[in-house]
UniProtKB/Swiss-Prot annotation:
Subcellular location: Cytoplasm
Lineage of the organism: Bacteria, Pseudomonadati, Pseudomonadota, Gammaproteobacteria, Pasteurellales
Family: Belongs to the RimP family.
Protein name: Ribosome maturation factor RimP
Broad class of the protein's primary localization: cytoplasm
Alphabetically ordered keywords of this record: Cytoplasm, Ribosome biogenesis
Record bears the keyword Cytoplasm: yes
Species this chain originates from: Actinobacillus succinogenes (strain ATCC 55618 / DSM 22257 / CCUG 43843 / 130Z)
Gene Ontology biological-process entries: ribosomal small subunit assembly; translation
InterPro entries to which the protein is assigned, alphabetical: Ribosome_maturation_RimP, RimP_C, RimP_C_sf, RimP_N, RimP_N_sf
């Protein structure tokens, strides 16, 4: 069964691309009876406020017609930012060699949070170098991942 994020990604991807942007990912966060639907968009040269406004208008119109969300919600559209979240294995592949933080659904070695250098993606696994040692994680066990920005 597909998640709400997966359904929204499928529903909205084409419209966002028609506006010249890439739908980088979607997060849905529930707080009581309300939900925040956060769309991350990206494009060559960066995302402007106008890009976010255009995507927000287009997506709002689609969600009003399709009505896939039963709860009250707020729609947010933004760039992925410096601490870019990673949603797909292909996104992980684009950032091999970068430092990332991952949060796991099920702990590995009694830890849910790991930080290290992204080394490789292979057979639905993500390998990080943590304290000089390779650590392999099943992609399906990664709840959240973010790039660690370099300053």
């Amino acid at each position: 069964m597909a998640t709400l994020e997966q359904n929204l990604q499928e529903m909205l991807q084409g419209s966002v691309e028609d506006l010249g942007c890439e739908l980088w990912g979607i997060e849905c966060q529930r707080a009581g009876r309300f939900m925040t639907v956060r769309l991350f968009i990206d494009k060559e040269g960066g995302v402007s406020v106008d890009d976010c406004a255009d995507v927000s208008r287009q997506v709002s119109a689609i969600l009003d017609v399709e009505d896939p969300i039963t709860d009250k919600y707020n729609l947010e559209v933004s760039s992925p930012g410096l601490d870019r979240p990673l949603f797909t294995l292909s996104q992980y592949e684009r950032f091999i060699g970068e430092d990332i933080t991952i949060h796991l659904r099920i702990p590995v070695s009694d830890r849910r949070k790991w930080q290290g250098k992204l080394e490789k993606i292979e057979n639905d696994t993500v390998t990080l170098t943590v304290d000089g040692q390779p650590q392999v994680f099943v992609f399906g066990n990664i709840q959240k991942a973010n790039i660690i920005p370099k300053f």
